[in-house]
Amino acid sequence: MRRIVTGVDATGQARIQSDGVPTQVYTLPGNGPTVYEIWNRIRILDFLPEGRDRSSYDQSSLRKHPSWMGVAGDTAASFAGHCVDYCIVLLGEMTLIRGETEIMVRAGDVVMQRDTKPAWVNRSGRLSRVAFILVETALE
């Protein structure tokens, strides 16, 4: 994963400010995804295929990051919050679980999550990658 950030320096010139791996990368327990914090509200997650265990995760990394994400059951990663999430499948395919409903999403598909807590499971047998863009909404 490579992140390139552009900006303007003190003289007003456009510059490349950074080029490399995102500074915040962490892995969630068990079959949890690897999370790449691209920017404040943009995350890209790599989901291992269901059934593969990632037993050597760093417990301390979980304590450093906000609890916007949890692991439900053994393999389904679920997300909570008062926001609209734009979920863009970049690589592979995922199963989106909401209550009794399951739907397959593939590379190129976009899911809009509105104040819901669905679970995501990778049943494809290969690595899958999903970008999440989080937009907070006000509670009424």
Predicted regions: what is each one?
Residues 1-3, 42, 81-84, 93, ...:
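Extracellular structured ligand-interaction cores
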Residues 72, 95, 102-109, 115-140:
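Ligand-binding loop in jelly-roll beta-barrel domains
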Residues 1-41:
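N-terminal leader/capping segments at the start of a protein or of a new domain
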